[in-house]
């Protein structure tokens, strides 16, 4: 066992040869490297698989022995200052390593086919492998400086991947927005690290926690300064995990390829913030105000993310806001001190969200045969619907992911979300009501995405109804036929204007600037699943894309049993609690207590009921449009024109405006922060040009005129110089004489 831990340092570096060899190959042998480009997918998967096996071995030893292993090397030693590099293997490290490697492998296999058409194929796999290296280095770090280095590398990789299609201005702006927003949090993180080093004199986690606890116990620190440093540390996690108010970069990050979205939202970038708070939880728990702040930010993010997802038209952005809300649940759990439930939800959400993103990628891939390469169309749920018969495997898989995120048993997210909601009742009834209500909103918007994508009829082929009052079928459309608005208020949710429908049926293919090439045979091939390519309709994805989706379905079905919250006499079924035995859990400090079946069933029924209510509302509002038209008179008999209907329309329009305008937070930032910074820049520029340059230029002009004046006085005659000299001396002597008097 000791030997296994000694070689754990190799974990972050195993995926690193792929980007290095690709870079060297493109530099020295560009033609050969590009011709053999499909080979790199296999090498990336192989190296990450080795890391996964290594991580599983470490995890088994962690579960059996509950040990913590740390190894450090001295890098810089100078008098009282020393900087060490090393690695730390504990339950948190082993959990994150398995999460990163398993999700990373399925995403890489999926990407081989998804990116086969792209000229940036080699660049994509180089970035992905380096992303895995950076994240693995982050989770194995043994001190704050090492974490900060890999933290910045993760941010750099996300910048490169979000802006992968940098020839598209929208993607270029998105990666810049993500980079700048994260710089705010990263600057706070750096200041917090330096602050705690100034307080404790150590960067190492174990020394830092011990010294800081003693200082707090003996009341030897400035509590205000300590709180400020802790807030700055937390700011880094807020930005990286897209928590309010630094969440604005997350929906724009969807401009990258879909496999990148799956990796970022499941196991890498957004998980880094949760990991950082979990790693520093022994530091935060001795500062009660910080724990309260963490839980407050978490509950705000839970509700905000859910409300922003309610009316999204872009399938990936809807899932992005879902990620934001679920990360809020994890942050809420950490703020409450429920360490176990936070990590449990991190695990279950990662596999479910990876499944949903890869499923959405399969849908987008199939829609591109109809609408061409145009993300505004291929990702727009307005054009979808009725995909069940065209992509049945993707549909079934997406349904499993949707039900899991809704919290329906026995799927993965049910177990973890239910545990967080139950813990919230112990912490704060107000927070519990918000968390419980948001679970219903989650079920509503997730099932809405599912219904608009797969149920009903294919909306692109809905042109037979374009001359009727009911032909338009957008999601929350603000503009629509007046005949519809007068007769049927619920169809205001399903309207769009006539000009948008005209371009639905264009046969023009929109290719990305210089980034698209002909599709070639994937390097990785999987057994046939029975998919057929019928290009007049969406078609099921290739086997290489379906296989990772089906693997994630298995994870979504069974990974929740890893943390079953009840044990029986003589049988310890709660593997996760056993795994986390050395860790801190404030709400459940005795994890060996047996939980009563009746109590568990009551809590589960309470949380599942709100999920089913959300699903019911979504099914009522977003059932197939054709069925709505057939039952139009029946529905109109219940919904009459009057004050109540006008009030309902105002609520719907308010929800639409709030969601589509991102809660007006981006507009607020653009007006006050961006506008304010630009105004300050213009003022600084004016001051520099008019004042600073004016002084410099004025001195130069004055010197010029003085020189010219002196030049005109001096004529080159020595007698004139002597006369002036004697005159000045005489004047000086007279002044000196009169002053002495």
Curated annotation (Swiss-Prot):
It catalyses: a plastoquinone + NADH + (n+1) H(+)(in) = a plastoquinol + NAD(+) + n H(+)(out); a plastoquinone + NADPH + (n+1) H(+)(in) = a plastoquinol + NADP(+) + n H(+)(out). GO terms for molecular function: NADH dehydrogenase (ubiquinone) activity; quinone binding. It is a multi-pass membrane protein. It is found in: Plastid, Chloroplast thylakoid membrane. Its EC number is 7.1.1.-. One of its GO terms (biological process) is ATP synthesis coupled electron transport. The chain crosses the membrane at residues 9-29, 40-60, 89-109, 125-145, 147-167, 185-205, 219-239, 258-278, 289-311, 318-338, 344-364, 396-416, 425-445, 546-566, 605-625, 721-741. NDH shuttles electrons from NAD(P)H:plastoquinone, via FMN and iron-sulfur (Fe-S) centers, to quinones in the photosynthetic chain and possibly in a chloroplast respiratory chain. The immediate electron acceptor for the enzyme in this species is believed to be plastoquinone. Couples the redox reaction to proton translocation, and thus conserves the redox energy in a proton gradient. PANTHER family: NADH-UBIQUINONE OXIDOREDUCTASE CHAIN 5. This is NAD(P)H-quinone oxidoreductase subunit 5, chloroplastic.
């Amino acid at each position: 066992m000791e030997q296994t831990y000694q070689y754990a340092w190799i974990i972050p570096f195993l995926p690193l040869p792929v980007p290095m060899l690709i870079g060297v190959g493109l530099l020295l042998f560009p033609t050969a490297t590009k011709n053999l480009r499909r080979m790199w997918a296999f090498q990336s998967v192989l190296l990450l698989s080795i890391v996964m096996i290594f991580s599983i071995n470490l995890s088994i030893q962690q579960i059996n022995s509950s040990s913590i292993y740390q190894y450090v090397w001295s890098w810089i030693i100078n008098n009282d200052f020393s900087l060490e590099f090393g690695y730390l293997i504990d339950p948190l490290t082993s959990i994150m390593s398995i999460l990163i490697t398993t999700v990373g492998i399925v995403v890489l296999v999926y990407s081989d086919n998804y990116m086969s058409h792209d000229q940036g194929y080699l660049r994509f796999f180089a970035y992905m492998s380096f992303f895995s290296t950076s994240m693995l280095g982050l989770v194995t770090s043994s001190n704050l400086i090492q974490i900060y280095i890999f933290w910045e590398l993760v941010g750099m990789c996300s910048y490169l991947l979000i802006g992968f299609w940098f020839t598209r201005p929208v993607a270029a702006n998105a990666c810049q927005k993500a980079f700048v927003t994260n710089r705010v949090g990263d600057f706070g993180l750096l200041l917090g690290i330096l602050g705690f080093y100034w307080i404790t004199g150590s960067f190492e986690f174990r020394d830092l926690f011990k010294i800081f606890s003693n200082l707090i116990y003996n009341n030897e620190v400035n509590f205000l300064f300590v709180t400020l440093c802790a807030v700055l540390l937390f700011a880094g996690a807020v930005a990286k995990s897209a928590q309010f108010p630094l969440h604005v970069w997350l929906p724009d990050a969807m401009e990258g390829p879909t496999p990148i979205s799956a990796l970022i939202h499941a196991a890498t970038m957004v998980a880094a913030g949760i990991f950082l708070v979990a790693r520093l939880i022994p530091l935060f728990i001795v500062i009660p105000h910080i724990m309260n702040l963490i839980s407050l930010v978490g509950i705000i993010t839970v509700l905000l993310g859910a409300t922003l997802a309610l009316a999204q038209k872009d399938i990936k952005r809807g899932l992005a806001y879902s990620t934001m809300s679920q990360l809020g649940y994890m942050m809420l759990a950490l703020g409450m001190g429920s360490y176990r439930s936070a990590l449990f939800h991190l695990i279950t959400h990662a596999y479910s969200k990876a499944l949903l993103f890869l499923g959405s990628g399969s849908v987008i891939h199939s829609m591109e045969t109809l609408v061409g390469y145009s993300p505004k169309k291929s990702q727009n749920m307005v054009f979808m619907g009725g995909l069940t018969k065209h992509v049945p495997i993707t549909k079934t898989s997406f349904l499993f992911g949707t039900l899991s995120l809704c919290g329906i048993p026995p799927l993965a997210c049910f177990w973890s979300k239910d545990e967080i909601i139950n813990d919230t009742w112990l912490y704060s009834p107000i927070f519990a009501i918000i968390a419980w209500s948001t679970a219903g909103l989650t079920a509503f918007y997730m099932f809405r995405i599912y219904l608009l994508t797969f149920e009903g009829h294919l909306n692109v082929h809905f042109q037979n109804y374009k001359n009727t009052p009911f032909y338009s079928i957008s999601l929350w459309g603000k503009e629509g036929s007046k005949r519809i608005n007068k007769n049927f208020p619920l169809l205001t949710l399903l309207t769009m204007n006539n000009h948008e429908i005209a371009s639905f049926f264009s046969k023009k293919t929109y290719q990305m600037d210089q980034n698209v090439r002909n599709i070639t045979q994937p390097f990785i091939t999987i057994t046939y699943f029975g998919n057929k390519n019928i290009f007049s309709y969406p078609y099921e994805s290739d086997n290489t894309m379906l296989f990772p989706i089906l693997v994630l379905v298995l994870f979504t079905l069974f990974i929740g049993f890893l943390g079953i919250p009840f044990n029986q006499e003589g049988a310890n079924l709660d593997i996760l609690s056993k795994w986390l035995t050395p860790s801190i859990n404030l709400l459940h400090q005795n994890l060996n207590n047996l939980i009563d079946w009746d109590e568990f069933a009551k809590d589960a029924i309470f949380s599942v009921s709100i999920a089913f209510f959300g699903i019911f509302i979504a099914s009522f509002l977003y059932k197939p449009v054709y069925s709505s038209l057939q039952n139009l008179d029946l529905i109109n008999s219940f919904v009459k024109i009057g004050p109540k209907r006008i009030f309902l329309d105002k609520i719907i329009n308010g929800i639409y405006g709030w969601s589509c305008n991102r809660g007006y937070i981006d507009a607020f930032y653009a007006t006050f922060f961006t506008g304010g910074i630009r105004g300050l820049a213009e003022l600084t520029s004016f001051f520099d040009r008019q004042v600073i340059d004016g002084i410099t230029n004025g001195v130069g002009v004055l010197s010029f005129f003085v020189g010219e004046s002196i030049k005109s006085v001096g004529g080159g005659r020595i007698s004139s110089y002597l006369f002036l000299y004697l005159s000045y001396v005489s004047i000086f002597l007279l002044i000196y004489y009169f002053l002495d008097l």
